[in-house]
Amino acid sequence: IHFTKLVKVRVSLNTPYISFPQRVPKKWKYHWVCKNKDVNPKYPIYVVSKNRGDSRLTIKCLERLNIPYYVVIEPQNYGEYKVVIDKKKILVLPYSNSGDGVGRSRNWVWDHSKSMGFKRHWVMDDNIVDFHRLYGNRKLPIGDGGMFRVCEEFVDRFKKFGITIKSLNR
């Protein structure tokens, strides 16, 4: 504890490493913002998470962009998430520690989305720091939910899309 106070770095049991001096996050001069009136996605966004209540990378990003979402967790993680996330945004799976991986959770999300009357939905991992768009030969972070809305409107033009994947580049 004394060491972490000395170097001014928060360390938890899940911290794989620390950097000293701390890295300064890149400050972007520009953001890509959608020009449409309604920039929020029309389909629900689900973030499937397990044991990452301390980091919540994707959730922090979506909240910064004012994009509505649901976080899908197992019952044993509820206490960890309820103190930092609005309870209306938390969906608790009906099972815990199934050992089946994320596939069973994604199937549950699919059923939940269909029961709410949606024909599509977004499913994201819980380790996404930011979303970017390549525009004018420059990589720009997005400033609102317009990117999701544009993708939805593109996919909705076609009838035979079963699954659509937005690429993840790190």
Feature locations, PLM:
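Short, solvent-exposed loop/turn segments at secondary-structure junctions
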Residues: 52, 127-129, 170
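Short, hydrophobic beta-strand segments that form beta-sheet elements in well-ordered domains
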Residues: 45-49, 68-75, 164-167
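Conserved catalytic core of nucleotide-sugar-dependent glycosyltransferases
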Residues: 131-170
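N-proximal low-complexity "stem/linker" segments adjacent to membrane-targeting elements
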Residues: 1-64
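Conserved acidic residues
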Residues: 43, 119, 162-164
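Residue-level signal for alpha-helix termini/capping positions
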Residues: 63, 114, 156-159
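Conserved alpha-helical elements of sugar-nucleotide-dependent glycosyltransferases
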Residues: 54-57, 105, 150
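Active-site-proximal specificity loops/subdomain of glycosyltransferases
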Residues: 73-124, 129-146
